[in-house]
Curated annotation (Swiss-Prot):
Gene name as annotated: fst
GO CC aspect terms: extracellular region; extracellular space
Molecular function in Gene Ontology: activin binding; calcium ion binding; collagen binding; extracellular matrix binding
Biased composition (Acidic residues): 321-333
Disulfide bridge map: 32-55, 42-88, 56-91, 95-106, 100-116, 118-150, 122-143, 132-164, 192-225, 196-218, 207-239, 270-302, 274-295, 284-316
Lineage: Eukaryota, Metazoa, Chordata, Craniata, Vertebrata
N-terminal signal peptide: 1-29
Protein name: Follistatin
Induction statement: By activin.
Organism: Xenopus laevis (African clawed frog)
Length: 341
């Protein structure tokens, strides 16, 4: 009698449990992906055994889902050999509730697919003219710079208004920053460190290219900043009255080059390999010789032991005009690391 009463209840509980288990499996089955490629396949696996609802609740554009519950070996083959998983279902078909993050907005493209595009808020920008970025490039306005920042240069910022210049003339730096022309003859706005600790070791002394001994790298950077143009490092240690490069001891990997104009030597790296030069890379050096590039000029200096410096870009026979490029091909070093040139 007892068994007859319990058996129907047990069957009911087993049936309910089985239904819940199958429902759980049906909801959980599937894989969540972070993006959908141009070929329509899902890429960058986020999690397995995830329902579409859970996968798509983030609101992130690009998140996609596949229904197939397949072993890891199949997922591996899809990702490595087939460019992603087939039957990819994008979470977002429209821009509704899409979160693109700051400085971006969702927009339907020509294929009627939602895409996040750069759309910085430029409504509060008062200066409408060109600006010079900290990358040494000129942008037509601050809004264009913000778009470039959005597209992959997160550290990009405005350093001063107007086109990037080769001199500090007419450069108005914001706040307490000062204009400095670096060793590549580009003007930058930097904050001068006016307090340097006193040297505690003779190893901290540096000889500048101006023949002055500085207490440390901090003191040399400070002098550079206050002067408004690069001084550069001649060699480590206090400056000496050298008669030739034989009197100067360079650190490993450097060679002494003699500056005959001032009767001083400086240590320089001489292991640079020069790549293929472009026609607009030519420079006129201090020996009035045209070199295919600044690198080639440095190689010539290293081979002769005589210091060469750039007089101006282009051929020595060309007419030099004070022009300002809209954009530089190469991004100059604006960190003011002390170098030998």
């Amino acid at each position: 009698m007892l068994n007859e009463r319990i058996q129907p209840g047990m069957i009911f509980l087993l049936t309910v449990s089985l239904c819940h288990f199958m429902e759980y499996r049906a909801v959980q089955a599937g894989n969540c992906w972070l993006q959908q490629s141009k070929n329509g396949r899902c890429q960058v696996l986020y999690r397995t055994e995830l329902s579409k609802e859970e996968c798509c609740k983030t609101g992130r554009l690009g998140t996609s889902w596949t229904e197939e519950d397949v072993p890891n070996s199949t997922l591996f083959k899809w990702m490595i050999f087939h460019g992603g998983a087939p039957h990819c279902i994008p979470c977002k078909e429209t821009c509704e509730n899409v979160d693109c993050g700051p400085g971006k907005k969702c927009k339907m493209n020509k294929k009627n697919k939602p895409r996040c595009v750069c759309a910085p808020d430029c409504s509060n920008i008062t200066w409408k003219g060109s600006v010079c970025g900290i990358d040494g490039k000129t942008y037509k306005d601050e809004c264009a710079l913000l778009k470039a920042k959005c597209k992959g240069v997160p550290e990009l910022d405005v350093q001063y208004q107007g086109k990037c210049k080769k001199t500090c003339r007419d450069v108005l730096c914001p706040g307490s920053s000062s204009c400095v022309v670096d060793q590549t003859n580009n003007a930058y706005c930097v904050t001068c460190n006016r307090i340097c600790p006193e040297p505690t070791s003779p190893d901290q002394y540096l000889c500048g290219n101006d023949g002055i001994t500085y207490g440390s790298a901090c003191h040399l950077r400070k002098a550079t900043c206050l002067l408004g143009r690069s001084i550069g490092l001649a060699y480590e240690g206090k400056c000496i009255k050298a008669k030739s490069c034989e009197d100067i001891q360079c650190s490993a990997g450097k060679k002494c080059l003699w500056d005959s104009r001032v009767g001083r030597g400086r240590c320089a790296l001489c292991d640079d390999l020069c790549g293929e030069s472009k026609s607009d890379d030519t420079v006129c050096a201090s020996d009035n010789t045209t070199y295919p590039s600044e690198c080639a000029m440095k190689q010539a200096a290293c081979s002769t032991g005589i210091l060469l410096e750039v007089k101006h870009s282009g051929s020595c026979n060309s007419i030099v005009e004070d022009t300002e490029e809209e954009e530089e091909e190469e991004e100059p070093d604006y960190s003011f690391v002390i170098s030998s040139w």
